[in-house]
């Protein structure tokens, strides 16, 4: 049984690391170079949360829980919010409540202040602040105009931290930020300005759903390898998207009904776009087809009409 678990863990690791590596024998691939698997493994290992919960430990945990998705978001989520034994205590300092973990880090659990410019600390009572937890901003800042700046040690922003926070106008994200959980800024419909740091590797599903006033989405300096499902859906004012060359997959409804979107680049690594990813935008599908991008079976709906996808047989 122990040997079987090791094999399953290894397979999960390989699946995660190779999920976006293009097949060099596939006729539809672009000129992207294949990703160095060894380098990716080193990058994953460098994000070890704790000696007591390594990436390999997470893979075993994910397998035991029957997890379908294996990624950094779920790794962080398991350690900080699911497995109880790692949290040591809760405390409060100034305008922030926080939780302390066995790896001597802290995660902000609540903001009790009333400032319009909210700056999360780099450290709190000597602990590096590595995450913003599931703070209920919606009940206190639903309409008040605010700006948010993350601390220099922040690695992740939890899901739904700022969702339905209609008043949030500007977000300044730190270099070092690695993951934005699913739904983190959903329905932040006053948000007009946000930067995406070069260290960012994952943005979860629907993280910026219905952020109506974001006009430009500059992801070009990030390390994203996919644009998650619904990530920027209903961003009605978004006119331009700049993707990093590392993106190889754009998932379902990623830019769904971004009705102003007319400009998006095609990364060299991109090989797959879901049929609904660009539905309701002004993007010309022909540009992607000519680059050999796989849209999958069926039709893609754009600008209120169906456009057939003329795919070559593989």
Go through the PLM ranges and name each one.
Residues 25-51, 55, 60-67, 71-72, ...:
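N-terminal, intrinsically disordered, polar/charged segments of Gram-positive cell-envelope systems
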Residues 78-89, 103-111, 308:
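Generic recognition of long tandem-repeat/solenoid scaffolds
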Residues 1-6:
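Positively charged n-region of N-terminal signal peptides that target proteins for export
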């Amino acid at each position: 049984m122990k040997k079987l678990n090791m094999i399953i863990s290894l397979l999960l690791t390989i699946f995660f690391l190779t999920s976006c590596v293009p097949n060099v024998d596939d006729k539809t691939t672009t000129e992207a170079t294949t990703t160095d698997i060894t380098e990716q493994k080193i990058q994953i290992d460098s994000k070890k949360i704790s000696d007591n919960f390594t990436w390999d430990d997470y893979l075993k945990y994910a397998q035991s829980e029957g997890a379908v998705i294996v990624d950094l978001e779920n790794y962080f989520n398991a350690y900080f919010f699911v497995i109880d034994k790692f949290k040591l205590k809760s405390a409060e300092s100034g305008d922030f409540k926080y939780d302390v973990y066995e790896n001597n880090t802290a995660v902000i659990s609540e903001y009790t202040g009333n400032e319009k410019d909210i700056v999360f600390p780099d450290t709190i009572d000597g602990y590096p602040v590595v995450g913003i937890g599931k703070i209920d901003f919606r009940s206190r800042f639903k309409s008040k105009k605010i700006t948010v700046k993350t601390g220099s040690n922040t690695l992740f922003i939890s899901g739904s931290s700022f969702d339905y926070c209609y008043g949030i106008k500007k977000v300044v994200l730190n270099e070092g930020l690695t993951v934005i959980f699913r739904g983190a800024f959903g329905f932040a419909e006053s948000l007009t300005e946000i930067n995406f740091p070069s260290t960012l590797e994952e943005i979860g599903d629907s993280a910026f759903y219905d952020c109506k006033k974001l006009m430009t989405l500059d992801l070009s300096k990030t390390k994203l390898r996919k644009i998650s499902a619904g990530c920027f859906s209903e961003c009605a004012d978004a006119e331009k998207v700049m993707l990093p060359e590392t993106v190889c997959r754009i998932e379902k409804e990623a830019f769904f009904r971004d009705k102003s979107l007319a400009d998006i680049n095609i990364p060299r690594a991109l090989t797959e776009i879901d049929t609904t990813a660009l539905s309701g935008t002004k993007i010309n599908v022909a540009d992607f087809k000519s680059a050999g991008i796989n849209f999958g079976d069926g039709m893609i709906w754009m600008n209120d009409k169906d456009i057939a996808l003329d795919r070559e047989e593989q």
